[in-house]
Structure formats: C-alpha cells, structure tokens
C-alpha cells in the first residue's frame, strides 16, 4: 500500500493495481477504489501522480503531471487512462517534482519537472527527457529533499539537503553531487532526518538528526558521519 496526499494505491495479491483519490486522477475514481492495471510489481506516488512498473519492466503513469516529471504527453488536467512512458525499468521513486528510475542495467536516471527549468521535449519518452545520474545502482531512497543510493558494490552515496548531517558526508553543507559515505552495505533505510545502513557483517550504522535519540547511541547529538550502533547479542539480519 502507498499513501499520498491526494491519491492512494494498493497492489493486490494477484498483482493488480488499484487507486482511490479525491481529485479525480483515476477514471471515475471520486474516492472509490478503481482498478488501473494488471501484472504490476511496484508503484510510486506524488501528490497528484501515480507511476508504476509492470512485471515486464514497462513504466506507466497517470495523473495531473503539472510539471512534466512523469512524462505523460498531456501535462495538465485530468488524465483518465494510464500511459506507457518507459521500459526496461527495475525500480522507481518520486520526490516532489522529480521522478527517478533504475533501469535493468543499473543506470539511474532522473526526470525533473519544469519547476526546475530543465528543458526537455514534452512529447519525448520519459527516458529521453531524463538525465543519467549514476551507474551500478540497485536501490534508491528519496525522503523529502535528500537522496540515498545503494550501489551493487555495497557503497552508499548521498546528496541533497543536509539538515542535521543526514547526508553523512562529514559536514552540514548541502551537496548537489552524489558522494560516497560508507561501503560494504547490505541494506539502506532512510527517514526525513536520519539514515541507517546494515552492513554485510551484520553491524548497524546510523547518522543524521538525533534530537530525540533516534540514532540509539545513548546521546541526543546529531552525527554527520556514519557511526556504528552497538547492541548486545549477535548482529542484525535485516531492517525496515
């Protein structure tokens, strides 16, 4: 289940995608649950848009697309039917006016809405209006205004707004370029203010805001670099 400000979505056990909203994004939705498509493996939401991936790697979208980030040709007003906007996509993420897609070959692309004054052809495919960010990417998290990527070699990269050191790059300065902050990572989890990495050796590392003891290090001081969080017993197997 995914919950947005004005639209919600669920993928059922049979891989069918259903949405409900209060702004008329879906066909005759009007707050009622409506089936959109079959064979869906992932869905991502913004305030007014729905983007999803099918089992065959096709990327589809519907919504208002006020800024052009999701790549449907009608970039204003209601969009009554989902439109194919890409293919060979493994993972998608939406952050405000930006849509990110990881392709099957590990390439990470970003398409930004016109609020950023990027120039692209509204009639072009999603990928032709996007820019390549990184290679060898297996996972990405985009909580609010910063970005965290896990690459296939286990390295973790961050960029964006650096409130309370949530980038983990050793400073409190914002960064508009991806920077490596830790290696040997197995899994990454992020919130709006702090981040966590589970390493291959089972150790847990965290960084960022710690006003309420979120990091679990026994203090309430933020950390601008990843720090190991020690607990009694054996290592961790996974995290959410």
Predicted feature descriptions by range:
Residues 5-6, 15, 47-48, 57, ...:
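Short coil/turn segments that connect the beta-strands within blades of beta-propeller domains
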């Amino acid at each position: 289940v995914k919950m947005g400000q004005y639209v919600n979505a669920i993928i059922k056990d049979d891989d069918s995608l259903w949405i409900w909203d209060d702004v008329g994004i879906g066909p005759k939705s009007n707050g009622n649950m409506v089936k959109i498509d079959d064979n869906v493996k992932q869905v991502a939401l913004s305030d007014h848009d729905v983007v999803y991936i099918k089992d065959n790697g096709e990327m589809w979208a519907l919504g208002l697309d006020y800024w052009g980030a999701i790549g449907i040709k009608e970039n204003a007003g209601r969009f009554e039917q989902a439109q194919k906007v890409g293919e060979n996509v493994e993972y998608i993420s939406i952050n405000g006016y930006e849509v990110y897609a990881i392709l099957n070959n590990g390439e990470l692309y970003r398409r930004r809405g016109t609020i950023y004054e990027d120039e692209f052809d509204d009639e072009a495919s999603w990928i032709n209006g996007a820019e390549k960010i990184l290679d060898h990417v297996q996972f990405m998290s985009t909580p609010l205004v910063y970005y965290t990527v896990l690459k296939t070699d286990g390295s973790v990269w961050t960029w964006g707004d650096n409130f309370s050191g949530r980038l983990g790059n050793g400073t409190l300065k914002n960064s508009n370029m991806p920077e490596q902050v830790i290696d040997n990572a197995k899994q990454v989890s992020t919130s709006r203010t702090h981040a966590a990495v589970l390493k291959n050796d089972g150790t847990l590392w965290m960084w960022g805001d710690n006003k309420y003891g979120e990091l679990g290090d026994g203090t309430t001081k933020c950390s601008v670099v990843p720090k190991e969080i020690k607990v009694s017993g054996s290592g961790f197997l996974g995290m959410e």
